[in-house]
């Protein structure tokens, strides 16, 4: 068991990044539970390069169904089934995404594991744990006695539900993780109630993520030091020393929360 909650950035890149792995974080709670937030197509390689075996992951939380956030789930499912003898880990999925995650994304690659098996379902590969959602504000789900998840609806792209995540360890708010969202003043106000904030960031204004300029202009200077920027493009170095007191989350770096 750890004495502190820790967050390791497995990947920090945008959907089209070639320098960085898909944006993903591994959170170790003080009870020893290892929760991976999102699992895009390059995340299994990112875990491997960090020396983190899939066997050590207790659960995966999905924030939305874009490929750079779920594209690695097929590999995890098949590895657990055929290499680890049918091991099933937790899959924490917002209740609105359980059906589309399987029907629209994973079913094509996982539908027929072998000829003699009945047609599988998502629950044949994972222990599916549905997370409460709300169209407005926050929804709270207790995962274990000392571990809870809060979901905040985000605006990312039309016709897709997506969520930011607040993590609670032993009754203490630990970190706000935006996943993917356009600039949203109300969401940032929620975020700043947490001790630490990991927020997605793009280097131009307009599009489906908050821009660096929007975040700089809205977040008070006294709060910026608690904010780490993630989900950025390959031209990261062009923006060194241009983030105010905010910092870039670094791929492979572990943060004590």
Curated annotation (Swiss-Prot):
One of its GO terms (biological process) is symbiont-mediated suppression of host innate immune response. Residues 21-231 are annotated as: Beta-lactamase-like. Its cofactor is Zn(2+). Zn(2+) 2 binds at residues 64, 66, 156. One of its GO terms (molecular function) is metal ion binding. SUPFAM superfamilies: Metallo-hydrolase/oxidoreductase. InterPro entries: Anti-Pycsar_Apyc1, Metallo-B-lactamas, RibonucZ/Hydroxyglut_hydro. Signal peptide: none annotated. It comes from the Viruses. Keywords: Host-virus interaction, Hydrolase, Inhibition of host innate immune response by virus, Metal-binding, Viral immunoevasion, Zinc. Coordinates 2 Zn(2+) ions. One protomer coordinates the metal ions and the opposing protomer provides the catalytic residues required for cCMP hydrolysis. It holds the Pfam family Anti-Pycsar_Apyc1. It catalyses: 3',5'-cyclic CMP + H2O = CMP + H(+); 3',5'-cyclic UMP + H2O = UMP + H(+). Zn(2+) 1 binds at residues 68-69, 180, 231. Belongs to the anti-Pycsar protein Apyc1 family. Counteracts the host Pycsar antiviral defense system. Phosphodiesterase that enables metal-dependent hydrolysis of host cyclic nucleotide Pycsar defense signals such as cCMP and cUMP. Homodimer. This is Anti-Pycsar protein Apyc1. It comes from Bacillus phage SBSphiJ.
């Amino acid at each position: 068991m750890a004495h502190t909650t820790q967050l390791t950035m497995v990947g920090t890149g945008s959907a089209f990044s070639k320098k960085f792995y898909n944006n993903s974080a591994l959170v170790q709670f003080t009870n020893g539970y290892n929760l991976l937030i999102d699992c895009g197509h390059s995340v299994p390689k990112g875990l491997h390069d960090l020396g983190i075996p899939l066997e050590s992951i207790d659960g995966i939380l999905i924030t939305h169904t874009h490929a750079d956030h779920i594209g690695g789930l097929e590999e995890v499912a098949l590895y657990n089934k055929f290499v680890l003898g049918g091991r099933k880990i937790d899959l924490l999925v917002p209740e609105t995404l359980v059906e589309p995650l399987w029907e629209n994304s994973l079913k094509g690659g996982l539908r027929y594991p072998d000829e003699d098996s009945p047609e599988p379902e998502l629950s044949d590969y994972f222990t599916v744990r549905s997370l409460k959602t709300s169209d407005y504000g926050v929804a709270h789900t207790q995962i274990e006695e000392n571990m809870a998840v809060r979901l905040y609806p985000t605006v990312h792209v039309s016709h897709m539900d997506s969520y930011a995540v607040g993590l609670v360890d032993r009754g203490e708010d630990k970190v706000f993780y935006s996943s993917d969202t356009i600039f949203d003043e109300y969401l940032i106000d929620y975020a700043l109630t947490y001790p630490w904030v990991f927020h997605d960031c793009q280097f131009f204004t307009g599009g489906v993520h908050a821009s660096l300029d929007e975040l700089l202009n809205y977040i008070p200077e006294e709060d910026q030091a608690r904010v780490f920027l993630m989900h950025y493009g390959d031209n990261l170095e062009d923006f060194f020393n241009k983030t105010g007191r905010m910092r870039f989350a670094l791929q492979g770096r572990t943060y004590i929360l």
